[in-house]
Design a protein with these regions (language model features):
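Conserved beta-strand positions in repeat-built beta-propeller and related beta-rich domains
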Residues: 87-91, 132-136
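C-terminal motif of bacterial Sec signal peptides marking the signal peptidase cleavage site
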Residues: 18-21
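Bacterial signal peptide processing site
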Residues: 23-25
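Short coil/turn segments that connect the beta-strands within blades of beta-propeller domains
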Residues: 82-84, 127-128
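Beta-propeller fold detector
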Residues: 45-62, 106-114, 144
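Structural motif
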Residues: 92-97, 138-144
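Short loop/turn segments that connect beta-strands within beta-propeller blades
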Residues: 99-103, 144-148
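Repeated scaffold domains used in trafficking and secretory/extracellular systems
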Residues: 28, 68-78, 115-127
Length: 149
């Protein structure tokens, strides 16, 4: 009588371990997170921007403080293939690169572009990099999450 109980117990344990081993092992590789075109977003009264097309909402107050400005009319946002967000605005000296974490954006890189401020920045998706163009000056920069290429 004890023998079948032990066998049943061993089988149950084996099934539990087998099920646990097969659990969250599904991995999808070579994911391309890139946005084909930039988003141009206007902050609300609370300095929040919301991109409904790509389902992201965040507060830009800390970026404005870092740039030493109180407000902007709009920000430029684009995401590259590895999933990093690039943020800038007219009057900014820098492009901010953020990594998406659970419920937050963490600053990965602050890329200094100019001391005079960007006049009319625009982002373009270029496959291997993000192109930043200042439409007022014609200056162009190739960026990735580590800086200027």
């Amino acid at each position: 009588m004890a023998k079948p109980t032990y066998i049943a117990l061993i089988l149950c344990v084996a099934v539990m371990f087998g099920t646990a081993a097969c659990g969250p092992s599904l991995v999808i590789q070579d994911v391309d997170y890139s946005q084909p075109i930039e988003s141009v977003l206007s902050p609300d009264a609370n300095q929040e921007v919301h991109d409904q097309r790509f389902s992201i909402k965040f507060n830009i107050s800390s970026i404005l403080r870092e740039e030493g400005v109180n407000s902007v009319e709009e920000i430029r946002l684009i995401r590259n293939a590895p999933g990093f967000y690039f943020v800038t605005a007219s009057g900014f000296n820098n492009v901010y690169v953020f990594k998406a974490d659970e419920g937050e954006l963490s600053l990965k890189e602050k890329i200094n572009i100019t001391r005079d401020g960007l006049s009319e920045p625009a982002f373009n998706q270029r496959g291997s990099h993000i192109e930043l163009v200042d439409l007022a000056t014609g200056q162009s920069y190739n960026l990735d999450q580590t800086g200027i290429q």
